[in-house]
Curated annotation (Swiss-Prot):
UniProtKB keywords: Aminoacyl-tRNA synthetase, ATP-binding, Cytoplasm, Ligase, Metal-binding, Nucleotide-binding, Protein biosynthesis, RNA-binding, tRNA-binding, Zinc
PANTHER family (alphabetical): ALANINE--TRNA LIGASE, CYTOPLASMIC, ALANYL-TRNA SYNTHETASE
Alphabetical GO biological process terms: alanyl-tRNA aminoacylation
Molecular function (Gene Ontology), one example: aminoacyl-tRNA deacylase activity
Natural source organism: Streptococcus pneumoniae (strain Hungary19A-6)
PROSITE patterns for this protein: AA_TRNA_LIGASE_II_ALA
Record's comment describing the protein's domains: Consists of three domains; the N-terminal catalytic domain, the editing domain and the C-terminal C-Ala domain. The editing domain removes incorrectly charged amino acids, while the C-Ala domain, along with tRNA(Ala), serves as a bridge to cooperatively bring together the editing and aminoacylation centers thus stimulating deacylation of misacylated tRNAs.
Signal sequence interval, chain numbering: none
CDD domains (alphabetical): AlaRS_core
Pfam families reported for this sequence: DHHA1 (PF02272), tRNA-synt_2c (PF01411), tRNA_SAD (PF07973)
Gene responsible for this protein: alaS
TM helices/strands, residue ranges: none
EC number: 6.1.1.7
Protein name as annotated: Alanine--tRNA ligase
Zinc in keyword set: yes
Length: 872
C-alpha cells in the first residue's frame, strides 16, 4: 500500500476517474445555492441532485468530485470516537444514465488494488451487499474477490423518501486483530457491531429504482436512466493509508493539534483521552470553511450551528487551560493544510479570523451571563429546600449559554447539589431528533420526468433578438409529447427563441406567439430550462399549434427592458457593496423582477444609514457616468484571467458570458443587460434587512419606480411640512428640532413636578414608621406611573434617617412593582424581595441595599405589605 499525503490521496482519486472519462466537478460552497431543502451541503451527491432527478442533463454523464460537507446531527460524538467529524470531504464518482454496476465495481477494485493507484492488499478488503442483489455479488467474484470476503447485509438498500433508490455495496478495510480485542471477527460486519477493525472506506449506490413510499420495495419501478452514486470519506481513506489509529492522527488534523499543544502547554497523547484536542481540531475546520463560504455565527439556522461549534471548541480550550480567545489563531493552519485544493481559506483568512475572534469574545461575555443564570437557579432551589437542578435548566444552560453539563455539575457540587442527568439527556435527545428529522426532509430527490429527459432536439437562445421566426420542434401536453394542441396550458420548444428562460436570478420573459398571418395563437406566461437545456415555454393556447410549423416569437420588450435595468443595477450594487463594505459582501441570492431588484449578500451586521447612502450614491454615479455595458463569450479560464467575478457555488460550462460595465464591474452572467448604464436612469434603495444569520437583503428600484419612490418620500415630507407650518420642505428639520427642544423642556418640568409630588407624598409615607425586633421599617403602597418613581422615593428616603428598611409597592397597569431598600447589613434587600415576590406571583432580586421585583397579582398587595414584619 502506497504511503500518500491527504493531498495526494485526493488528487489520485480525481486523476483515476479522469482516466475513465469523468469530468472533475469542483467542490462547491458549503452553503447551498438554490436549494432551500438543505441547511448545509451534507454529501458529495448533494450538489448533483439536479442531474440525478433529471431536472438537468449534464454535459458529461460521468462525474467525479472531492466535495467538502458538513453534518452536525451527531455533534456530541465528535471527539469521543475515532471517525466522527462535523466537516469532512466526500470523494465520489457518479454515472448519470451511463455506466452501471459492472463498471462501477470493476473500476473501484482497480483503483484500490492496482499498484499504479492506491495498491491496497486485496486480502484486507471486505465487501457487503444487499442479499437480493446477486449481480453485485457475482461481479465482485468476477473481479477477483474471495467469496468469504462478501457479506450480505439486509440494510444495504439506499432510499430517502420518493425518488431514485437502489441497493448499495460497501467496501471495508480490515485493520487486523489488534483492533479486535475480543476476537469477534467477521461477525462485526455481519451483525453491524460498532468496531475499529473493519473500517468502511467506500459506499457504491446502484440507483436503479424510483422509490414510492406507497408501495412495497418489490414493486418499485425501474428508473428510465440508471445511475451510480458513490462516496468515499477522504479522512477514513487517509487514516487507513497513513496507518493512523484514528482520523485525527493524520496530516489533515495533526498540524492543528500541534498548534493547540503550543497554545495550551499540554501534550496530545495518542493513547490517552484527547477529546478536547479532537473537538478543537474538528470544529475549527468547520468554522473556517463555513465562514469562508459566507455563513456567519448567529441564533438560528446554520448561524446557530456555527455558534454552537465555536462555543463547544472554546469550552474545550478552557479544559486545556486556554482562557482567552485562541481559535482564530488556528485558521492559518487550517488554510495551509487544505491550500492545494481549497485556497479560499487562506484567501479569506483575515475575514475568517475577525469573525471567529469576535465570536469568541462575545461568548466570553455570554458565559459570564450564564454563570449569573446558574447562580440564580441555585439560589431559588435553596429557598425551596431542593437540591437537584432540573434537566431542562441544565439543557438551557447548555443550549443558550454554551455550558457543558460538566460545568453545571461543578457549580451544583459547590452548592451541595446534583443535576438531573436523565432530564438533560432527554432534552438533548429531543433536540437531536428534531435535527435528524429536519435533515431527512431535505434529502430526497424528485422523481425523474422521462418525457422531458427524452427531448434532445436543439434549441438556441438569441440574446439580441426581441422577435424572430422559428420552427416549433416539441409540444408537451399532460406530460407527453404530442403532434398538435388547440387549447389549454401546454409547453413548447422552438429551434430558436428570443425568450429568456428564468435563470441566475432573472425572471423569465413574457410575450406572444403569432402564426404566419400575424394572428396571436398563444401567450407565453413562463419560460424554464428543460433537462437538456432547451427553453421550455409555458403558454396559454389561443388557436391550434402544430409541430414543425414556423411561428413568430415576440417578447414583451418593455417588460424585458425593465428587467434588464434591474439586472445591470444588481451588478453595480454588487460592486458597490465590495467597495464600501468589503470583499466578503458577496452575493448569496438575487431576484431581478420587473418592478424591483432584490439582492442578498453576506455581511455580519446591519448596514448603517451612512453605508447605505454611500452605496446608493456610488451606484447612481456609475449610472450617470453612462458606462458602456459589454458582453463577450469565452472559456471559463480566460474569463477568470480577465478578472471576472464567479459566484461561489454556481456551476459554469466550458463557454461563459462575461459582462463588463466600464472598468467598474466584471462578472460571469448569462442574463440580459442594458447597453449603457444611463438607460437605468435612477437607483434607490428602499429597504435593508437581515434574513438570517450573516445574510442581509437589499430591496431596490430603478428608473420610473425609483422616481416614484422619491416622489412618495417628497409627498410625505410635504405633508409633515404642512403640519408643522413650514413654508418649505427644507425647513422641516429646523421645525422638528424646535419641537424636540420644547419636548425636552416639558419633560424636564414634568420630572421636577413629579419629584416635588413624590417628596410631598413621601412626607406622609415616611412618617408611618413601624418597628419589629429592633428594626424600623416603612411598608406602604404608593400611586405612581412608572417604576422609576419608586426609585425617586427611595432616593429621598436615603437622604434622612427615616427607618432601616423601606418597602414600596405600586400597581402599574395590570402589573405589580415592588421596591425594597435597606440601610443596614443585617437586612439584605435582595434576599427580602425574593421572599416577598411570590406573594404577588412574581420574581425579583438585587443588591443588599436595593432590590426590585415584578408580579401580576394585584389583590395580594396588602398581603405582601403585611408579610414584611414576619420577615424581620
Amino acid at each position: 500500500m502506497k504511503q500518500l499525503s491527504s493531498a495526494q490521496v485526493r488528487q489520485m482519486w480525481l486523476d483515476f476517474w479522469a482516466t475513465k472519462g469523468h469530468s472533475v466537478e469542483p467542490s462547491v460552497s458549503l452553503v447551498p445555492v438554490n436549494d432551500p431543502t438543505l441547511l448545509w451541503i451534507n454529501s458529495g451527491v448533494a450538489t448533483l441532485k439536479k442531474y440525478f432527478d433529471g431536472t438537468i442533463i449534464p454535459e458529461n454523464p460521468r462525474i467525479t468530485n472531492a466535495q467538502k460537507a458538513i453534518r452536525t446531527n451527531d455533534i456530541e460524538n465528535v471527539g469521543k470516537t475515532a471517525r466522527h467529524h462535523t466537516m469532512f470531504e466526500m470523494l465520489g464518482n457518479f454515472s448519470i444514465g451511463d455506466y452501471f454496476r459492472d463498471e462501477a465495481i470493476t473500476w473501484a477494485y482497480e483503483l484500490l488494488t492496482s499498484p499504479e493507484w492506491f495498491d491496497f492488499p486485496a486480502e484486507k478488503l471486505y465487501m457487503t451487499y444487499y442479499p437480493d442483489d446477486k449481480d453485485s455479488y457475482n461481479r465482485w467474484i468476477e473481479v477477483g474477490v474471495d467469496p468469504s470476503h462478501l457479506i450480505p447485509i439486509e440494510d444495504n438498500f439506499w432510499e430517502i423518501g420518493a425518488g431514485p433508490s437502489g441497493p448499495d455495496t460497501e467496501i471495508f478495510f480490515d485493520r487486523g486483530e489488534a483492533f479486535d480485542p475480543e476476537n469477534i471477527g467477521l461477525r462485526l460486519l455481519a451483525e453491524d457491531i460498532e468496531n475499529d477493525r473493519y473500517i468502511e472506506i467506500w459506499n457504491i449506490v446502484l440507483s436503479q429504482f424510483n422509490a414510492d413510499p406507497a408501495v412495497p420495495r418489490s414493486e418499485y419501478k425501474e428508473l428510465p436512466h440508471k445511475n451510480i452514486d458513490t462516496g468515499a470519506g477522504l479522512e477514513r481513506l487517509v487514516a487507513v493509508i497513513q496507518g493512523a489509529k484514528t482520523n485525527f492522527e493524520t496530516d489533515l488534523f495533526m498540524p492543528i493539534i500541534r498548534e493547540v499543544e503550543k497554545l495550551s502547554g499540554k501534550v496530545y497523547d495518542q493513547d490517552g483521552d484527547n477529546m478536547s484536542f479532537k473537538v478543537i481540531a474538528d470544529h475549527i475546520r468547520s468554522l473556517s470553511f463555513a465562514i469562508g463560504d459566507g455563513a456567519l455565527p448567529g441564533n438560528e439556522g446554520r448561524g446557530y450551528v456555527l455558534r454552537r461549534l465555536l462555543r463547544r471548541a472554546s469550552m474545550h480550550g478552557q479544559k486545556l487551560g486556554i482562557n482567552e480567545p485562541f481559535l482564530y489563531k488556528l485558521v492559518p493552519t487550517v488554510g495551509k493544510i487544505m491550500e492545494s485544493y481549497y485556497p479560499e481559506v487562506l484567501e479569506k483568512r483575515d475575514f475568517i479570523e475577525k469573525i471567529v475572534k469576535s465570536e469568541e469574545e462575545s461568548f466570553a461575555r455570554t458565559l459570564h451571563s450564564g454563570q449569573h443564570f446558574a447562580q440564580g437557579i441555585v439560589a431559588d432551589l435553596k429557598e425551596k429546600g431542593q437540591s437537584v437542578i432540573a434537566g431542562q435548566d441544565v439543557f438551557k444552560l447548555y443550549d443558550t449559554y454554551g455550558f457543558p453539563v460538566e460545568l453545571t455539575e461543578e457549580i451544583a457540587e459547590e452548592a451541595g447539589m446534583t443535576v438531573d442527568r436523565e432530564g438533560f439527556e432527554a432534552a438533548m435527545k429531543e433536540q437531536q431528533e428534531r435535527a435528524r428529522a429536519s435533515a431527512v426532509k431535505g434529502g430526497s430527490m424528485g422523481m425523474q420526468n422521462e418525457t422531458l429527459q427524452n427531448i434532445t432536439v436543439e434549441s438556441v437562445f438569441n440574446h439580441n433578438a426581441s422577435q424572430l421566426s422559428s420552427k416549433l420542434v416539441a409540444i408537451v401536453a399532460d406530460n407527453a409529447e404530442v403532434e398538435a394542441v388547440s387549447e389549454g396550458t401546454t409547453s413548447l420548444i422552438f429551434a430558436e427563441t428570443p425568450f429568456y428562460a428564468e435563470m441566475g436570478g432573472q425572471v423569465a420573459d413574457h410575450g406572444q406567439i403569432l402564426d404566419e398571418s400575424g394572428k396571436v395563437v398563444a401567450t407565453v406566461t413562463n419560460v424554464q430550462k428543460a433537462p437538456n437545456g432547451q427553453a421550455l415555454h409555458t403558454v396559454e393556447v389561443l388557436a391550434p399549434l402544430a409541430l414543425n410549423q414556423e411561428y413568430t416569437l415576440a417578447i414583451d420588450s418593455n417588460r424585458r427592458h425593465r428587467v434588464m435595468k434591474n439586472h445591470t443595477a444588481t451588478h453595480l450594487l454588487h460592486a458597490a457593496l465590495h467597495n464600501i463594505l468589503g470583499n466578503h459582501a458577496t452575493q448569496a441570492g438575487s431576484l431581478n423582477e420587473v418592478e424591483f431588484l432584490r439582492f442578498d449578500f453576506t455581511h455580519f451586521q446591519a448596514v448603517t444609514a451612512e453605508e447605505l447612502r454611500a452605496i446608493e450614491q456610488q451606484v447612481n454615479e456609475k449610472i450617470w457616468e453612462a458606462l458602456e455595458v459589454k458582453t463577450v463569450e469565452t472559456d471559463i479560464d480566460t474569463a477568470k484571467e480577465m478578472g471576472a467575478m464567479a459566484l461561489f457555488g454556481e456551476k459554469y460550462g466550458k463557454e461563459v458570458r462575461v459582462v463588463t460595465i466600464g472598468d467598474y464591474s466584471i462578472e460571469l452572467c448569462g442574463g440580459t443587460h442594458v447597453g449603457n448604464t444611463s438607460e437605468i436612469g435612477l437607483f434607490k434603495i428602499v429597504k435593508e434587512e437581515g434574513i438570517g444569520s450573516g445574510t442581509r437583503r437589499i430591496l431596490a428600484v430603478t428608473g420610473k419606480e425609483a422616481f416614484e419612490a422619491y416622489r412618495e418620500q417628497e409627498d410625505a415630507l410635504k405633508a409633515v411640512a404642512a403640519t408643522l407650518k413650514a413654508p418649505q420642505v427644507k425647513e422641516v428639520p429646523h421645525k422638528v428640532e424646535g419641537l424636540q427642544e420644547q419636548l425636552r423642556q416639558l419633560q424636564k418640568e414634568n420630572a421636577e413636578l413629579k419629584e416635588k409630588a413624590a417628596a410631598a407624598a413621601a412626607g406622609d409615607i415616611f412618617k408611618d414608621v413601624k418597628e419589629v425586633n429592633g428594626h424600623r421599617y416603612i411598608a406602604s403602597q404608593v400611586s405612581v406611573s412608572d417604576a422609576g418613581a419608586l426609585r425617586t422615593f427611595a432616593d429621598n428616603w436615603k437622604q434622612k434617617d427615616y427607618s432601616d428598611l423601606l418597602v414600596l409597592v405600586a400597581a402599574i397597569g395590570d402589573k405589580v412593582n415592588v421596591l425594597v431598600a435597606s440601610k443596614t447589613k443585617d437586612l439584605h434587600a435582595g434576599n427580602l424581595v425574593k421572599e416577598l415576590a411570590p406573594i404577588i406571583d412574581g420574581r425579583g432580586g438585587g443588591k443588599p441595599d436595593m432590590a426590585m421585583a415584578g408580579g401580576s397579582n394585584q389583590p395580594k398587595i396588602q398581603e405582601l405589605l403585611d408579610a414584611v414584619a414576619g420577615k424581620l
